[in-house]
Amino acid sequence: MAEAAQQDGEIGEVREAHRFDVKRLEAYCREAVEGFSGTLDVRQFSGGQSNPTFLLTEEGPRGLKRYVMRKKPPGVLLASAHQIDREYRVMKALAETDVPVPHMYALCEDDSIIGTSFYVMEYLEGRVFRESTMPGSSEAERRAIYSNLAENLARLHKVDYEKVGLGDFGKPGNYFERQIGRWIKQYRGAQTTDIPSMEELIKYLPEHIPDEQSVTIAHGDYRLGNTMFHPTEPHMIAVLDWELCTIGHPLADVAYNCMYDLLGVAGGVGPIDRTKTPGIPTDKEFAAEYCRHAGRDGIEDWNFYLAFSMFRLASISQGVYKRGLDGNASSERAMTLGDACRNLADHAWEILQRKD
C-alpha cells in the first residue's frame, strides 16, 4: 500500500511567523464550535503554500477530538488572494451534494481573535497522495484512484451551483477573460524579473480564448494532492483546498489536473515514466475518463486549456516566491520556487507551438 500523508501533510511546531494566542482561540471555539469544551493543543501542517493550516486537538470531557483550522497568512496580501471565507462557503454549500467535503464548524472573520480570519473544519483520517506517481501503489490501485479522481471532478461540475446557494459566487462574463486578467495582474504585482515566455503568454492567451463557454463550479486547484482517499480503499472521502474556487469553466479544472499530475511540469516532477509506474493515465486518457463521467463528447482546443493552466500556476508560483522574499510565506518551500514561474511559462509557450 502506498504511503501517504494525512489531511494536509506532515505535522510540526507552529512556525514563528504564524503563532497566535491559543487561549483566545479556545475561548472562541467554546462559543462557536458545537460540543467544544476543552483545551487546545495546536500543531502546524507543513503542506500547502498559501493558507497556513493547523491541527487542533481538543482535550476535554469527551476525550480527545481533532479539528483542522485554516487561516490567512500574516502581512500585506494581494486583495484577491487568501479568501478563506470562500473556501468555507463552498464546502458548506456542497455538504448536501455527492461531492465529498469535510464538515464545516465555524468561520471567524474577526481579526482580533488570532490576528487574521480563519475557519475550523472536520479532521478526517485518510490518505493524501503527495506524489502523482503514487509510489508503492499497485497498477490496479493507481488506475482506480485516477478514475475516481475524474469521476468526482465530473460530480462537482454537475452540481447546480444556484440551487446550493452559490449563484453569486463568481463574476459575470467570460471566465477565461476574467482569469487571464486576474493572473496577469497578480503576476505583475509579484514580478521580480523579466520572463520572455510570460510576456508571450500575456499577449497570446487573451486573443485565443475558445468559443465554448460552459459554466459550472470550478475548484481551481483540483489535483491528486488536494484530495483525500479512504485509508485502504480507492475511493475519495474529501476534496480539499478550495481557496481558488469560483463559478467558471469545467475544462480549466480538467486541464489543471492533467498539467499538475500527469504531464510532470509542475513542482519539478519531470516527465512521468509510465513503464515504472503503470496504471497512471496520460493527460488525454484522463480527459476521456472525465468526459465519460460528465457525459461530454470530447474536448476541442486542449492545448489552450493546458497552456492557460500552466500560465496560471506560473503566476501563483511567482506570488508564493515573492511572499517568501518578503518573509510572509506559509511554507518553508516558498524559496525553492524561484525558477518555477519561468519553467512553467516556457512549457506553456512550447505547447502552444504544437500542431496536435
What residue spans do the PLM features occupy?
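Juxta-kinase regulatory segment immediately upstream of eukaryotic protein kinase catalytic domains
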Residues: 2-36
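ATP-binding pocket architecture of kinase catalytic cores
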Residues: 39-217, 230-233
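Conserved beta-strand->loop/alpha-helix structural units within folded catalytic cores of enzymes
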Residues: 104-107, 225, 300
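All-alpha amphipathic helical-bundle segments outside canonical DNA-binding/catalytic cores
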Residues: 170-171, 297-309
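Catalytic-loop of the protein kinase fold
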Residues: 217-219, 224
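Catalytic activation segment of kinase domains across protein kinase-like and atypical kinase folds
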Residues: 228-256
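Active-site activation/catalytic loop segments of kinase-like enzymes and analogous catalytic loops
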Residues: 252-294, 308-326
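Helical subdomain adjoining the active site within ATP-dependent kinase catalytic cores
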Residues: 298-299, 315-356
